[in-house]
Amino acid sequence: MAASIARGCQAAKGLGPSFRSARALLPVSTSVASRVLAGPGRRQITGPSEPGVFQPPPKPVIVDKRGPQRRESRFLSPEFIPPRGRTNPLKFQIERKDMLERRKILHIPEFYVGSILRVTTADPYANGKTSQFLGICIQRSGKGLGATFILRNTIEGQGVEICFELYNPRIQEIQVVKLEKRLDDSLLYLRDALPEYSTFDMNMKPVAQEPSREVPINQLKVKMKPKPWSKRWERPKFNVKGIRFDLCLTEEQMKEAQKWSQPWLEFDMMREYDTSKIETAIWNEIEASKSS
């Protein structure tokens, strides 16, 4: 019995080296390999870095270089600048505070003479207690709280103009349907032009405008009705650029109008109104009101 047990132990000792040699030939498991790679001094390779995994390229940034980019500029509404000759600007400083408080309630967008606007006002006698009017801005005038703008449209063949007070509490909304400029700072001569130049659909849809672009300038020149006109628009003091005078006046009439020219006024530096310092002070007031 003892001899058989001794022979069994010797056989087991002989099988030990054979098992160790067979284990060395087996492939290393994945868990063991990951522990080896994640050892000290090595980073563990996981995720999309493994070979055979697709990595999408970064999204390209497309820059439109077809047109000039608009510079980042701040728009200061012209009614903020006080008229020339005021030595004590206290009145306009107090008015600017009221104007800034009003702008916190009503959004007054950027617009120019020549832009098409839609204005919604409170009207106790209209259906829905509100009324709308759409038209082209032909004039901006006034300073401070007295700033006004005139909209013109032709309705059923009749020219209609409405003068709105910019800071009137009855105004509920001012929408810019089409933002653009014209060749002149005043378009009052549209009263004497053909009706087609001041006719717009009351249900006109807003035209999208990219904020990075410059405000476009409409180079349109209108055709006038036969004389008489409300004013002598051909005279140099009006400096009108948006009228086709060659279609309504003769050469003799144009020469006669040039007799009223005053070419020396172009070189009169005292007529220039430098508002750079005033604009800087006004912008400081605007920034202070925003932070308060």
UniProtKB/Swiss-Prot annotation:
Q: Which InterPro entries match?
A: Ribosomal_bL19 (IPR001857), Ribosomal_bL19_sf (IPR038657), Translation_prot_SH3-like_sf (IPR008991)
- What are the recorded Gene Ontology BP terms? translation
Q: Which Gene3D superfamilies match?
A: 2.30.30.790
One example of the protein's molecular function in GO is: structural constituent of ribosome
| This protein's record includes keyword Repeat | no
Residues with Phosphoserine modification = 77
Provide the disulphide bond pattern.
none
User: What SUPFAM superfamilies does UniProt report for this protein, alphabetically?
Assistant: Translation proteins SH3-like domain
Task: Provide this UniProt record's keywords sorted from A to Z.
Answer: Mitochondrion, Phosphoprotein, Ribonucleoprotein, Ribosomal protein, Transit peptide
Sequence similarity? Belongs to the bacterial ribosomal protein bL19 family.
By its UniProt entry, which PANTHER family does this protein fall under? LARGE RIBOSOMAL SUBUNIT PROTEIN BL19M (PTHR15680:SF9), RIBOSOMAL PROTEIN L19 (PTHR15680)
Assembly with partners or alone: Component of the mitochondrial ribosome large subunit (39S) which comprises a 16S rRNA and about 50 distinct proteins.
Q: What is this protein called?
A: Large ribosomal subunit protein bL19m
Annotated gene: MRPL19
